[in-house]
Design a protein with these regions (language model features):
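Short, well-structured active-site flanking segments
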Residues: 97-107, 190-193, 266-272, 427, ...
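Conserved catalytic neighborhood of penicillin-recognizing serine enzymes
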Residues: 113-141, 288-289, 386, 418-420, ...
Length: 704
């Protein structure tokens, strides 16, 4: 039969060089010639489909995003209801379950029709032929300039070969399943599962109604012309409804009326009438959006780096399990919106946002105090400093708040990992820990706090403009004094601190050279660093001086579910000695203790233990010149349970364009970044056990 059909095509196309030659040697020879170069039909076994890469949180349950070139979800035969199979064969290939991969009568009719008309080629393609055309023909055969009748002949031959290679019921099931996963349904929907989701919001094919299944089955014939969204109009309820006279509905109705000729489905008259009367209500176009978007984009970069440049993230069908803690992420986004967005809205809108975020009256006081302070953005990182796992990551105060976008607020830009900001006094612990590690200073050392010209015309002062004379290093750090910090850098040396910063994993904007060029000003945080890096560095202080590189990807599986990457233990680097780390920590935790630092502790102390106990935390704020950048960084004591989270949190607030806030009395870190940081850490740790910082055996204690 194949030979006869090819002969018909040969007869119609005599005149082309190929088929004139074929006619000379006979139809059988033409079939043999046309079969040359066709792929092995058993390639169906290895057929893969472009599938999106799915990104999940650390539990594998919360989908953060999907990277895709085509919207597709691959299904098995068992997932496809008989109704969908019947609607599909009714629309595309009524004899599918019995034919040899082609429909002889349809092909002969198409050839006759094309011979008697000067119009375009009539269709006669079965489901098997459509699958062959899409995936099992050489590229040159389906090229736009290829002879369409030669292509049709090769398609017919290959469809016959495919059916022979996969005989019987099982073979038909494989072929129709591949077809249903491959075929284009319009509107960026590839495969029946994606089509059900895009048009009707249905994720489980068994939930499709009879009318919905029929409409979907009718789309592949002409996805553009039959796209329901082209014809949909909103009704009084705001629903997208496709009129009954629209082409996709007319085709749906034709399929419904012919469903009873299919294999399994037999509609009663009442069922048919109900299906014909069912309005086509579309789900509405859903823009592709991510949860934790800045984090998810960073994950994409890391996955590409892990798998190599040859891996296609958009089509590879990978599943990525990340380090993200969804609860922590939600809290980070909540408090950034409350502290950086709400104060810049009009009063009614601000109050509405705070209500939706369920912000209590106590926190509303400091939030409302930020109104008019001209601070429009913020970024936050929370990580487990023992594993390097990034738990929460927000590169702006609201990725999707394009309605508020301005020079001062760029919602899409990632200020946590791509951007860099001046840390101000939050940098000082890096300088002092270097001094402790090299034994240039101890917490009991004295440094002179008096106005000094350190360079031509540069005589920095403390924020309060006071001079205290000789001060203990401990007090100089706790009260964030600038002049003693500069003297500390003098003792250690900029090169030594730059070396130490590299061990802490800190990347300066402009590189090491920028820090050295800053000279002694580098002691007070004038060189920009990434919040992600500085958060990790603070975590190293809590981890006995050992910095574990941040990571975001825990596991990658391929499209078959096989694990192809499992994150190794985080790379650990000794940044400072355990003794130096503890000395720094011991001083910084005083910032959260009222007896040691009543000013800073008012903003930073957290009392959320089981009975309201004080929670040991080491923290430091930072305010850059002119209050352009505000920061708070800190870390909790490591829990005794090695599997429990050891938390470090970093926060930046400011404006995207690096502009100084236009305010007569600008906010400082203690009134803006510190309370926001405090609220996040307070809420996140509410159910965590209390842990304390342990002193190394080599460290003694003396009163000075």
């Amino acid at each position: 039969m194949v030979t006869v059909l090819v002969a018909a095509l040969v007869t119609f196309t005599i005149g082309t060089s190929l088929l004139v030659g074929a006619a000379a040697v006979g139809t059988a020879a033409a079939v043999a010639a046309l079969s040359q170069g066709l792929p092995d039909p058993t390639n169906l076994n290895a057929l893969t489909f472009a599938q999106p890469t799915l990104v999940y949180d650390r539990t594998g349950k919360v989908q953060l995003g999907r990277f895709q070139r085509q919207q597709r979800r691959v299904v098995t035969f068992d997932e496809v209801p008989k109704l969908v199979l019947d609607a599909t064969t009714t629309a595309e290939d009524r004899s599918f379950w019995d034919n040899g991969g082609y429909d002889p009568a349809a092909i002969l009719a198409a050839v006759a029709g094309n011979a008697s008309s000067s119009g375009s080629e009539r269709g006669a393609s079965t489901i098997t032929q459509q699958l062959v055309r899409a995936r099992l023909l050489p590229a040159d055969v389906i090229a736009p300039d290829a002879d369409r009748y030669v292509r049709k002949a090769k398609e017919l031959i290959q469809a016959s070969r495919l059916t022979a290679a996969y005989p019987g019921e099982a073979g038909k099931q494989r072929i129709v399943t591949a077809y249903l996963n491959e075929i284009f349904y319009g509107h960026d929907a590839y495969g029946i599962a994606a089509a059900a989701k895009i048009y009707f919001g249905v994720g489980d094919l068994s939930k499709l109604t009879i009318a919905q299944a029929a409409l979907l089955a009718g789309l592949p014939k002409s996805p553009s012309n039959f796209d329901p969204y082209r014809y949909a109009v909103p009704d009084a309820k705001g629903r997208l409804v496709v009129p009954g006279t629209a082409p996709p509905v007319v085709r749906r109705d034709w399929i419904l009326r012919n469903l009873s000729t299919s294999r399994w489905t037999q509609l009663s008259q009442s069922q048919l009438d109900a299906a014909l009367a069912e309005p086509v209500i579309l789900a509405g176009e859903q823009p592709l959006s991510f949860l934790a978007p800045h984090f998810t984009w960073q994950v994409r970069r890391q996955v590409q780096a892990i798998l190599g440049p040859g891996a296609s993230i958009e089509t590879g069908g990978y599943t990525v399990i990340t380090t993200l803690d969804w609860r922590a992420q939600q809290l980070a986004e909540k408090w950034l919106a409350a502290g950086a967005i709400a104060p810049n809205l009009k009063p009614k809108a601000s109050a509405a946002l705070l209500r939706s975020l369920k912000i209590g009256s106590g926190d509303r006081r400091w939030i409302n105090a930020l109104r008019g302070k001209d601070l429009h953005n913020g970024a936050m990182v929370a990580l487990d400093y023992r594993t390097g796992d990034v738990l929460a990551y927000a590169g702006s105060a609201g990725y999707y708040r394009e309605d508020l976008a301005s020079r001062k607020f760029e919602p899409k830009y990632d200020a946590a990992g791509d951007g860099a900001r001046q840390p101000g006094s939050a940098w000082k612990p890096i300088v002092y820990s270097s001094a402790f590690d090299t034994r240039r200073l101890t917490p009991g050392s004295l440094l002179l706090d008096i106005a000094t010209e350190f360079g031509k015309g540069w005589a920095p002062r403390d924020a309060d403009q006071l001079e205290r004379g000789p001060v203990l290093v401990r007090k100089a750090i706790q009260y964030s004094l600038n002049v003693p910090a500069i003297r500390a850098l003098q003792r250690v040396g900029s090169n030594a601190v730059a070396d130490r910063a590299a061990k802490f994993g800190i990347r300066f904007t402009g590189g090491r050279k920028a820090f050295l060029q800053a000279g002694l000003a580098g002691a007070i945080g004038t060189v920009e660093v990434r919040p992600l890096d500085l958060t990790s560095a603070y975590g190293a202080l809590g981890n006995g001086g050992v910095r574990v590189a941040p990571r975001m990807v825990l596991e990658i599986r391929d499209a078959t579910g096989k694990v192809i990457y499992e994150a190794p233990k985080g790379k650990a680097t000794a940044a400072v000695s355990p003794q130096a780390a503890f000395l720094t920590t011991d001083i910084l935790q005083g910032n959260t203790q009222p007896k040691q630092n009543p000013i800073w502790s008012a903003a930073l102390e957290i009392r959320n233990g089981p009975r309201g106990q004080h929670r040991p935390i080491a923290a430091k704020t930072g305010t850059a010149n002119d209050a352009r950048d505000l920061a708070t960084y800190g870390y909790l004591a490591p829990p005794n349970d090695p599997k429990a989270l050891a938390l470090a949190v970093g926060l930046w607030m400011g404006n995207s364009d690096h502009s100084n806030p236009r305010s007569k009395k600008p906010a400082i870190s203690l009134t803006a970044a510190a309370p926001l940081w405090h609220a996040f850490v307070r809420d996140l740790t509410a159910s965590m056990p209390i842990a304390t910082f342990s002193r190394p055996n080599e460290i003694g204690r003396a009163h000075v």
